[in-house]
Amino acid sequence: MTRQESYNFDELLLSGHGRLFGPGNPQLPAPQMLMFHRITQMSEEGGAYDKGQVIAELDLDPDLWFFRCHFPGDPVMPGCLGLDALWQLVGFYLGWIGGSGKGRALGCGEVKFSGQILPEHKKVTYEIAFKRVINRRLVMGIADGWVSVDGEQIYTAKDLKVGLFQDPGDLSRSQG
């Protein structure tokens, strides 16, 4: 597979069906949980720590599913969906660099919300800056992330962690 520096929506859907990085490799969720429409930049260099970065975008539409239910009469995109998008991008990057296994979010150090995403907004931009990538028997990415809406940064997340697991059940057993 040739690594690309950007991906359109149809290519991201291939990832959701396990056909972008091959069988047994990280997958993105299918719509409606896929929280971006395109990845505009991927690199193993760059970002705030010069250890890799990902930039992605979501086009907003007042008819998106979450605006209809969160909250009736006061629609706002749930902050947890923006956070999940950041984890999705960390996992996608791990597959992009050749990591294998099923991606699982492992946590984050700190999340701050300083704004909200409303139906009248046009575009959400997600940015990931990698701090550390382990690509051995354990595959794990640690990154900081930012969410902006129409050019204004409104969320920050520090120390996002995603791991790739050959058997995701191992994660449950190790915590029980």
Swiss-Prot record:
Annotated catalysed reactions: a (3R)-hydroxyacyl-[ACP] = a (2E)-enoyl-[ACP] + H2O; (3R)-hydroxydecanoyl-[ACP] = (2E)-decenoyl-[ACP] + H2O; (2E)-decenoyl-[ACP] = (3Z)-decenoyl-[ACP]
UniProt subcellular location: Cytoplasm
Keywords: Cytoplasm, Fatty acid biosynthesis, Fatty acid metabolism, Isomerase, Lipid biosynthesis, Lipid metabolism, Lyase
Short name of one Pfam family: FabA
InterPro entries the record matches: FabA, FabA_FabZ, HotDog_dom_sf
Keyword Isomerase assigned: yes
EC identifiers of the protein: 4.2.1.59, 5.3.3.14
Main localization, broad class: cytoplasm
Annotated active site: 70
Cellular component terms (Gene Ontology): cytoplasm
MF GO annotations: (3R)-hydroxyacyl-[acyl-carrier-protein] dehydratase activity; trans-2-decenoyl-acyl-carrier-protein isomerase activity
Pathway: Lipid metabolism; fatty acid biosynthesis
Entry keyword Lipid metabolism: yes
Cysteine disulfide partners in this protein: none
Swiss-Prot/TrEMBL GO biological process terms: unsaturated fatty acid biosynthetic process
Job of this protein: Necessary for the introduction of cis unsaturation into fatty acids. Catalyzes the dehydration of (3R)-3-hydroxydecanoyl-ACP to E-(2)-decenoyl-ACP and then its isomerization to Z-(3)-decenoyl-ACP. Can catalyze the dehydratase reaction for beta-hydroxyacyl-ACPs with saturated chain lengths up to 16:0, being most active on intermediate chain length.
Subunit comment: Homodimer.
Database matches in NCBIfam families: fabA (TIGR01749), PRK05174.1 (NF003509)
Family assignment from sequence similarity: Belongs to the thioester dehydratase family. FabA subfamily.
Record PANTHER family: 3-HYDROXYACYL-[ACYL-CARRIER-PROTEIN] DEHYDRATASE, 3-HYDROXYDECANOYL-[ACYL-CARRIER-PROTEIN] DEHYDRATASE
Name of the protein in its database record: 3-hydroxydecanoyl-[acyl-carrier-protein] dehydratase
Organism field: Alkalilimnicola ehrlichii (strain ATCC BAA-1101 / DSM 17681 / MLHE-1)
